[in-house]
């Protein structure tokens, strides 16, 4: 992909600019609730996924104080002011162990899933806990975002999801399951009942070198892995991007990346293979988000990120490949122009 950077042509740029806006769902993260709710008021999103409920030491899901506060007031106010007055609201549950003790929290803990799926009794107890969480707010449904699942637990988790979807359907609610972009999870069959959404990102990130979160080849590979499913999965796209620096990889929102480019006096280039934007800038240039962290030396950084044209291009290709609804990870840090393109406003 690096060798294709200089191959952008005027025709490709015209094509990117002509990509239509698409209607989408979106996540609002509890650690960036004010910004997420503010963007909710700007976009015409179909469904909102409140991220997230975490797990305590007893493998019980719970809501943080910030999430509870949002559900008590901030969310309702934002929904009332959004262009779409009736978006559905889902609660997303993630297998993160979140405790107050330093160094004790674990993200995407497969052990939690193993213990919850181990026996019929443990699955029944977990189902009861999830249903109890849904009672704190008139949610449209529930989302299960369990990642790094041990492959031996995968069949039991799918069975659990199918049974839970039946229970929720009887209550007039829906279940959605998030699937990682890994062949071991996507190559098998999926039970009818739940909705499914595939994470179409993490092609590049803090685990490897510079590049876009997704590209056309990556999306086509995911479509091939999902082609045998009787259900049409949704497609989750990720906004923002990363900066590769001498001190590691730094997560960036679109706003931060664009401000960095502007401060450095650099015009980002659109990569034809991924439709993402990229540029290079010093870590201490004006607009750099690294200045606030200190320790900058003037070293060169490579930045890749998605804007509205990127997201709309991915969404258009995804739908042409057979994917269903698009979901945006996440609200907070996006420009109004990008929100308009991805929310269908």
Where are the regions a protein language model picked out?
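Glycan-binding loop/region signatures in secreted carbohydrate-active enzymes
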Residues: 99-113, 239-314
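Active-site groove signature of glycoside hydrolases
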Residues: 126-156, 202
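Extracellular low-complexity, Gly/Ser/Thr-rich intrinsically disordered linkers
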Residues: 291-344
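Short, acidic/polar
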Residues: 29-42, 120-135, 180-187, 307-317
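Substrate-binding surface in catalytic domains of secreted glycosidases
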Residues: 57-70, 154-268
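Glycan-recognition patch characteristic of GH18 chitinases/ENGases
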Residues: 22-124
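Catalytic domains of carbohydrate-active enzymes, especially glycoside hydrolases
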Residues: 34-58, 130-142, 317-325
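Bacterial N-terminal signal peptides
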Residues: 9-18
């Amino acid at each position: 992909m690096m060798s294709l950077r200089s191959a952008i042509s005027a025709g490709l740029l015209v094509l990117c600019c002509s990509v239509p806006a698409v209607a989408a769902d979106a996540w609002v993260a509890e650690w960036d609730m004010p910004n997420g709710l503010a963007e909710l008021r700007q976009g015409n999103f179909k469904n909102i996924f409140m991220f997230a409920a975490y797990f305590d030491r007893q493998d019980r899901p719970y809501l943080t104080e910030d999430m509870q506060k949002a559900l008590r007031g901030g969310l309702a106010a934002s929904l009332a002011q959004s262009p779409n007055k009736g978006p559905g609201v889902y609660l997303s549950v993630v297998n993160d162990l979140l405790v107050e003790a330093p160094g004790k929290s674990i993200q995407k803990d497969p052990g939690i899933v193993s213990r919850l799926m181990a026996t019929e009794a443990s699955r029944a107890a977990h189902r009861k806990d999830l249903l109890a969480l849904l009672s704190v707010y008139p949610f449209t449904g529930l989302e299960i975002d369990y990642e790094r699942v041990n492959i031996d637990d995968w069949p039991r988790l799918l069975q659990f999801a199918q049974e839970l979807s039946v229970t929720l359907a009887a209550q007039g609610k829906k279940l959605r399951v998030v699937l990682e972009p890994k062949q071991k999870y996507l190559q098998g069959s999926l039970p009818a009942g739940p909705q499914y959404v595939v994470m179409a990102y993490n092609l590049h990130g803090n685990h490897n070198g510079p590049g876009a979160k997704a590209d056309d080849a990556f999306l086509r590979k995911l479509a091939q892995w999902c082609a045998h499913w009787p259900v049409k999965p949704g497609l989750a796209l990720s906004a923002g991007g990363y900066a590769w620096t001498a001190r590691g990889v730094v997560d960036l929102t679109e706003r931060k990346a664009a401000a960095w480019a502007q401060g450095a006096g650099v015009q980002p280039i659109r990569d034809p293979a991924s439709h993402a934007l990229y540029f290079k800038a010093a870590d201490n240039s004006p607009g750099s988000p690294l200045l606030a962290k200190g320790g900058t030396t003037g070293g060169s950084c490579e930045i890749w990120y998605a804007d509205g044209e990127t997201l709309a291009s991915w969404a258009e290709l995804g739908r042409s490949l057979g994917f269903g609804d698009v979901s945006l990870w996440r609200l907070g840090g996006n420009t109004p122009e990008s929100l308009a393109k991805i929310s269908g406003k």
